Amino acid sequence: MSDYIASALSRDEHFRIFAADATQTVREAQRRHDTWSASSAALGRTLVATALLAASGLKNADDMLTVRIKGDGPVGALVTDGTNVGTVRGYVEEPHVNLPLNLVGKIDVARAVGKRGLLAVTKDIGVGDPFTGQVPLVSGELAEDFTYYLAKSEQIPAAVGLSVFVNADNTIQVAGGFMLQALPGANDAELSELEANVKTLPLVSELLKSGLTPEQIIQRIAGDEPVQFLDAQPLKFACNCSKEHFGDIMATLPHAQLQEMIDQDGGAETTCKFCGNQYHYSVADLEALMARHE
């Protein structure tokens, strides 16, 4: 089944609820970057959060949202991009990190990411300069960190859940998440009731493994109150890199540097950090890039 994000309004449109099945998306990220369990969980959670933030905060097809997380844990930096059309991409600085399970028998994402560091979200909506909101990490588990970001940087009371189940062979069994946002008009009693529902909710990975859909997860969060479902959005890992794009960057290099690639290496090769795609440039390709300056 293809990945998607479901969304809905609840409580007289006082709340927005999003839920995502991102299993195939995170599987593709794991395959492309050959991530091990702790790195997979950290990158997967960040990709899911990025998809949810993009679905809730971007309006136009060309808008872009970028998440950068740098903690003091062994996975290093996490960088992800998301769009309003349901595509995400990203990478983790150190893909080969395995750690002992934490005290509750789960992948120790907090230790992998680190509890000291920063989470930054940049929105580029094509008007003016991109806007960046930044907060310190509060737990390293990431769901709590994104909840804190929404409260402090965007002034949105929210609850975020992120979950990736990694098999013993490092493959991804399921991945997904949810985001509850309070809208203008929401009162404290309503928020407290929904937060109570969230606190008793099993991990999203457990719900997905049991066969629940994103719509059913949303209903579990809403409780007995009716919900108004909005259009579902397909979700997938996709990168907009290309040989032409990297060629444009290489064309800005000094002639001497390009000539050195020709004379010493007989060409050049570059790898996209976000997706792992490799692009080869022959001598003829490099000569064509040099000719742009003439």
From Swiss-Prot:
Key words of the record: Chaperone, Cytoplasm, Disulfide bond, Redox-active center, Stress response, Zinc
Major localization class: cytoplasm
CDD domains: Hsp33
Any one annotated GO CC term: cytoplasm
Entry annotated with the keyword Nucleotide-binding: no
Cystines in this chain: 239-241, 272-275
Gene3D superfamilies assigned to the protein according to its UniProt record, in alphabetical order: Hsp33 domain (3.55.30.10), HSP33 redox switch-like (3.90.1280.10)
Gene Ontology BP terms: protein refolding
UniProt-listed InterPro entries: Heat_shock_Hsp33 (IPR000397), Heat_shock_Hsp33_C (IPR016154), Heat_shock_Hsp33_N (IPR016153)
Record's comment on post-translational modification: Under oxidizing conditions two disulfide bonds are formed involving the reactive cysteines. Under reducing conditions zinc is bound to the reactive cysteines and the protein is inactive.
Function: Redox regulated molecular chaperone. Protects both thermally unfolding and oxidatively damaged proteins from irreversible aggregation. Plays an important role in the bacterial defense system toward oxidative stress.
PANTHER family, alphabetized: 33 KDA CHAPERONIN
Name of the protein in question: 33 kDa chaperonin
